[in-house]
Amino acid sequence: MEFDLGAALEPTSQKPGVGAGHGGDPKLSPHKVQGRSEAGAGPGPKQGHHSSSDSSSSSSDSDTDVKSHAAGSKQHESIPGKAKKPKVKKKEKGKKEKGKKKEAPH
């Protein structure tokens, strides 16, 4: 398997030459595709499997994700609050000049 992965990595570099050779053999073609997927996504699934094996670690990750989401929500709430303050200042300026006219239709 390691040999296949190594061979799959090499064709990625020598795409024109080796790619044509592999393309000729239907059996090698799917193998190459699988090898490529494993090589490309190898780091991702490997880590995923590790997390899956460690249930406690996976749970901690989930908790961290939830906390991150909560923090993100709070930040989002703060941002609109800050955005409103400048708008209020603009409205105050508008109230002094044209604010009364704008408020009447409102």
From Swiss-Prot:
Residues 64-79 have a biased composition (Basic and acidic residues). The modification Phosphoserine is found at S29. Keywords: Acetylation, Nucleus, Phosphoprotein. The modification N-acetylmethionine is found at M1. Its main location: nucleus. It is found in: Nucleus. It holds the Pfam family IMUP. Residues 82-99 have a biased composition (Basic residues). Residues 1-106 are annotated as: Disordered. InterPro entries: IMUP (IPR026621). This is Immortalization up-regulated protein. It comes from Homo sapiens (Human).
